[in-house]
């Protein structure tokens, strides 16, 4: 009888661990990660304007999951994600060389020898190449960078900025994200809201893009829209202004939308 009780106890303990591993990461988990000692001061100062506790739950992640933070720059979200998925999971901090350079100060501080940012794999690839294994990820995130896929590269000729090339192959990029996700995996996009039907020129100049346009582009590549958040909405934002204007920087109207790779 004692042996049976011992086996039953072990069974229920294992079941309890399994349930814990399968529990969705929610707002309280993200808030706990945000409250951890040793976070970078720059990250703490960003928390109020980025509201990760309202964004990350849309990813529908679980402890032990693998996720990619696309064009992550200095890795603000990467470290938070590493904290919530735990050492059983993995976070890919993905950058192109340009985004790597833009985020170099944050990356230097984040990966300093005297701190542990969690289980993060730095993943720098050329251009819009993601180079991720097929159906290897439970989630993907891109924050304030989706518009860069549409940007027309320009160069100053001494009088004005003139186009020197074409925008990226957005379809190729989205197909890569789709292929990297497991069925049921989510792709979350956060960006500055632009005016409807904005031209590529306006998207390039203002660093804004329309939510409806982005949604139609993503859905055209197999994703299904599943959720959104109004946590970063600001109706008073002037969408005709560049997002870097000092008095609106960090306070723009931002959309948050979540897509899923269909299971069947």
Regions inferred by a protein language model and the residue ranges of each:
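Class I SAM-dependent methyltransferase Rossmann-like catalytic core
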Residues: 30-62
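Short glycine-dipeptide loop
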Residues: 64, 87-88, 181-187
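Conserved class I S-adenosyl-L-methionine
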Residues: 64-73
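A short glycine-rich, Lys/Arg-flanked "PGG" loop and its adjoining helix->strand segment in the class I
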Residues: 82-83, 156-183
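A short acidic, Gly/Pro-enriched loop at the edge of an enzyme's catalytic core
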Residues: 131-140, 144
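Core SAM-dependent methyltransferase catalytic element
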Residues: 221, 238-264
